[in-house]
Every structure is written in C-alpha cells, then in structure tokens.
C-alpha cells in the first residue's frame, strides 16, 4: 500500500494512519 504525508485531511479513499512532522509542520499520514 502507498502512504503519503498530506497537509490537511486525507481523501475518502485513504485512511488516516498517523502524522508526519516536516520542518516543524504537522501533516497527516494517509494510506490507501
């Protein structure tokens, strides 16, 4: 499965799987 860090919410077909911290910003880890 593929995961990516997104700023904001995950899309419907993706599931929230954690958080990413990039340059002090919090992103959502979204996997599908």
From Swiss-Prot:
InterPro entries reported in the protein's UniProt record: Alpha-defensin_C (IPR006081), Beta/alpha-defensin_C (IPR006080)
SMART domains linked: DEFSN
SUPFAM superfamilies (UniProt xref): Defensin-like
Cell compartments where the protein resides: Secreted
Summary of the function given for this chain in its UniProt record: Has antibacterial activity against the Gram-negative bacterium E.coli and the Gram-positive bacteria L.monocytogenes and S.aureus. Has antifungal activity against C.albicans.
Family the UniProt entry places it in: Belongs to the alpha-defensin family.
Protein name: Defensin-3
Organism: Papio hamadryas (Hamadryas baboon)
């Amino acid at each position: 499965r593929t995961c990516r860090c997104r700023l904001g919410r995950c899309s419907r077909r993706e599931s929230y799987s954690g958080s990413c911290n990039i340059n002090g910003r919090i992103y959502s880890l979204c996997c599908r």
